[in-house]
């Protein structure tokens, strides 16, 4: 698709939902993408104006079987572990014992 000109006039506002979709694609083979939905919420307000941030609104573990920890940076591991901790804290109170055991395994720290 050809885009005649860039349009930067759009803006994110409180309550808008978007997705975060990191992925990898191997040309001519396949691709894989992990998707989470995020909501735009108010953050800090200062002399420069109202800042916004994103909060997760979907809480599903990322499949650790598809991850090679040795290829991740320390920051990437920290982000994944923090996300899985949040998934555990949000979801586990609503699960029975068997379901909690499953979630514990799939949100384990790497």
Predicted regions, residues:
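Charged, cofactor-coupling segments
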Residues: 1-110
């Amino acid at each position: 698709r050809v885009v005649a000109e860039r349009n930067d006039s759009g803006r994110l506002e409180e309550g808008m939902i978007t997705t975060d979709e990191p992925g990898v694609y191997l040309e001519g083979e396949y691709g894989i993408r992990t998707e989470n939905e995020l909501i735009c919420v108010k953050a800090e307000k200062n002399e420069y104006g109202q800042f916004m941030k994103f909060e997760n609104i979907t809480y599903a573990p990322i499949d650790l079987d598809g991850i090679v920890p040795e290829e991740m940076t320390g920051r990437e591991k920290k982000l994944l572990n923090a996300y899985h901790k949040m998934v555990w804290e949000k979801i586990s109170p609503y699960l029975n014992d068997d379901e909690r055991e499953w979630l514990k395994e799939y949100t384990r720290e790497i």
